[in-house]
From Swiss-Prot:
Residues annotated for ATP binding in this entry: K198, A199, R200, G201, G202, F203, G204, C205, V206, K219
Main location group: membrane
SMART domains, A to Z: S_TKc
Record protein name field: Activin receptor type-2A
Disulphide-bridged cysteine pairs: C30-C60, C50-C78, C85-C104, C91-C103, C105-C110
The gene coding this protein: ACVR2A
Length: 513
């Protein structure tokens, strides 16, 4: 009995000590290899130093393909803190016949060698004779089981506490059964790892994620928003949707079991976030305003354009239906790109445009005809609805511009002064439709030639008469013209107009880019 108890206690101490040392990592360097080094502009081979938070563990990883018994290495390098890599000194893939092999390990250069040993189920033969157990066996068993159970609970609790944010271990994308839509070949079966939540909304949330050596955005929809996810995927998959001013699409995925399914949309990641978030924290110069506004207009103009005869097919005209500053993202150089096509309509010849239910989008940005429920269900009518919302976004930009000879307003969404933060549909109908009010264009904005031109353009975008509104192409040309004709030198305290041009002939309203 004494010997059994000592043995059980020793096993318990070993189990607890293994949990106590979690979090240590001795991985400082890993073998580096990138098969796509020319495209990614990296070294092809070398040694990579691993960096990370002190309380995080670091690992090495390797991915490879086995084609006709030939090993083709895809990537090797450092890997982030990952439960699946803990205490693995050898880089071994154990999954049964994966398309792309992936392994991770701990220890310097441990990914120099990698191997594939699939786990196999071992069945015990039933014909073996049962040997009598020694009398102390049951005593030892009864002593060990409770202690091991306690040790297991302690270890599991520690793991859950320390890694509760790592809800998604690294996975190979696309999955074997993504369901409709089909898996995206652009992902190339690369390891994808979620890092942090960047935004939450009615659709779900947006994660910053790592796809090998680059950051991407992963928009995760709950299953009840499947229609929005499906619509975004279909719009992004149309011919000709690769454009500098439209958010870059990478892939769409269906994750989880039939009981608990999440829908993923993977796009390029932009650290500056949305135009709305940027304007909350920053003011903009005249040149910055013009650059953001022009690139936003070019993105919307391209979206609205019907382009036949492209190499990959016919790009139809597309109405966004939810243009707002939250759905305009900014690249590092402040180039704008249009995002979020969950409500978009595509106008393909001979096909239905889809759900043309009138009152969709964000109330604050709804055009008068949408608020009235008096939409003409034709293509041009939907494009003009986008232009009304674009006028409001341009107003947001103007309200944060330092070029005007007056104070810069605190950032506000459109109609906050008139209605407040949470307008009802009835509030919007009263102010926009019946009273025909719009956000205030400050008098001192009009004193500057360029800002005066911008204010005129804004008013023509949000005109109550939908047919009188400017096209996105015309807005882009006007802003280019404004910037060219108005040369402004700004300092911290002075705005000097060097060239003022009046009586300018603007491009026609239906001009396209």
């Amino acid at each position: 009995m004494g010997a059994a108890a000592k043995l059980a206690f020793a096993v318990f101490l070993i189990s607890c000590s293994s949990g106590a040392i979690l979090g240590r990592s001795e991985t400082q360097e890993c073998i580096f290899y990138n098969a796509n080094w020319e495209r990614d502009r990296t070294n092809r081979t070398g040694v990579e130093s691993c960096y990370g938070d002190k309380d995080k563990r670091r690992h090495c990883f390797a991915t490879w393909k086995n084609i006709s018994s030939s090993i083709d290495i895809v990537k090797q390098g450092c890997w982030l803190d990952d439960i699946n890599c803990y205490d693995r000194t050898d880089c071994i893939e154990k999954k049964d016949s994966p398309e792309v092999y992936f392994c991770c390990c701990e220890g310097n250069m441990c990914n120099e060698r990698f191997s594939y040993f699939p786990e196999m189920e071992v069945t015990q033969p039933t014909s073996n004779p049962v040997t009598p157990k020694p009398p102390y066996y049951n005593i030892l068993l009864y002593s060990l089981v409770p202690l091991m159970l306690v040790a297991g609970i302690v270890i599991c609790a520690f793991w859950v506490y320390r890694h509760h944010k790592m809800a998604y271990p690294p996975v190979l994308v696309p999955t074997q059964d993504p369901g409709p839509p089909p898996p995206s070949p652009l992902l190339g079966l690369k390891p994808l790892q979620l890092l942090e939540v960047k935004a939450r909304g009615g659709f779900g949330c947006v994660w910053k994620a790592q796809l090998l050596n680059e950051y991407v955005a992963v928009k995760i929809f709950p299953i009840q928003d499947k229609q929005s996810w499906q619509n975004e995927y279909e719009v992004y998959s149309l011919p000709g949707m690769k454009h500098e001013n439209i958010l870059q699409f990478i892939g769409a995925e269906k994750r989880g079991t039939s009981v608990d399914v999440d829908l993923w949309l993977i796009t390029a990641f932009h650290e500056k976030g949305s135009l709305s978030d940027f304007l909350k924290a920053n003011v903009v110069s005249w040149n910055e305003l013009c650059h953001i506004a022009e690139t936003m207009a070019r993105g919307l103009a391209y979206l609205h354009e019907d382009i036949p005869g492209l190499k990959d097919g016919h790009k139809p005209a597309i109405s966004h239906r939810d243009i707002k500053s939250k759905n305009v993202l900014l690249k590092n150089n402040l180039t704008a790109c249009i995002a979020d096509f969950g409500l978009a309509l595509k106008f393909e010849a001979g096909k239905s445009a889809g759900d043309t239910h009138g009152q969709v989008g964000t109330r604050r940005y709804m055009a008068p005809e949408v608020l009235e429920g008096a939409i003409n269900f034709q293509r041009d009518a939907f494009l003009r609805i986008d232009m009304y919302a674009m006028g409001l976004v341009l107003w947001e930009l103007a309200s944060r511009c330092t070029a005007a000879d007056g104070p810069v307003d605190e950032y506000m969404l459109p109609f906050v002064e008139e209605i407040g933060q949470h307008p009802s549909l009835e509030d919007m109908q009263e102010v926009v439709v019946h009273k025909k009010k719009r956000p205030v264009l400050r008098d001192y904005w009009q004193k500057l030639a360029g800002m005066a031109m911008l204010c005129e353009t804004i008013e023509e975008c949000w005109d109550h008469d939908a047919e009188a509104r400017l096209s996105a192409g015309c807005v882009g040309e006007r802003i280019t013209q404004m910037q060219r004709l108005t040369n402004i030198i700004t300092t911290e305290d002075i705005v000097t107009v060097v060239t003022v041009v009046t009586n300018v002939d603007f491009p026609p309203k239906e001009s396209s880019l």
